């Protein structure tokens, strides 16, 4: 259930702050959110897949760290990002 290259480039284009920006927190959080959504759908059919569940927890933790960093640096960008991604915080 990996993210396709087309979907990843679309997310980068949508959330990038500059042209060719792949490292900003907004882009990283958007990609992580897409991966988390895919894994969540995977678990609806594979309830006992504990190895992937550990990976999901790692992704959620990484996303939380990036969101905390963004909130500390720029509250406006943080609010805009969680509203556009539909993340509840």
Swiss-Prot record:
GO terms for cellular component: cytosolic small ribosomal subunit. GO terms for biological process: translation. Signal peptide: none annotated. Gene3D superfamilies: 6.10.250.3130, S15/NS1, RNA-binding. It comes from the Bacteria. The keyword Ribosomal protein applies. Pfam families: Ribosomal_S15. Keywords: Ribonucleoprotein, Ribosomal protein, RNA-binding, rRNA-binding. PANTHER family: RIBOSOMAL PROTEIN S15, BACTERIAL AND ORGANELLAR, SMALL RIBOSOMAL SUBUNIT PROTEIN US15M. HAMAP family: Ribosomal_uS15_B. Part of the 30S ribosomal subunit. Forms a bridge to the 50S subunit in the 70S ribosome, contacting the 23S rRNA. Belongs to the universal ribosomal protein uS15 family. One of the primary rRNA binding proteins, it binds directly to 16S rRNA where it helps nucleate assembly of the platform of the 30S subunit by binding and bridging several RNA helices of the 16S rRNA. This is Small ribosomal subunit protein uS15. It comes from Allorhizobium ampelinum (strain ATCC BAA-846 / DSM 112012 / S4) (Agrobacterium vitis (strain S4)). The lineage of its organism: Bacteria, Pseudomonadati, Pseudomonadota, Alphaproteobacteria, Hyphomicrobiales. The gene is rpsO.
């Amino acid at each position: 259930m990996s993210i396709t290259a087309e979907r990843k480039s679309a997310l980068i284009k949508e959330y990038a702050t500059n042209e060719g920006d792949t490292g900003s927190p907004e882009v990283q959080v958007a990609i992580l959110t897409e991966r988390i959504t895919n894994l969540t759908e995977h678990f609806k059919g594979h309830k006992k897949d504990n190895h992937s569940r550990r990976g999901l927890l790692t992704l959620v933790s990484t996303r939380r760290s990036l969101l905390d960093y963004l909130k500390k640096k720029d509250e406006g960008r943080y609010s805009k990002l969680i509203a556009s991604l539909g993340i509840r915080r």
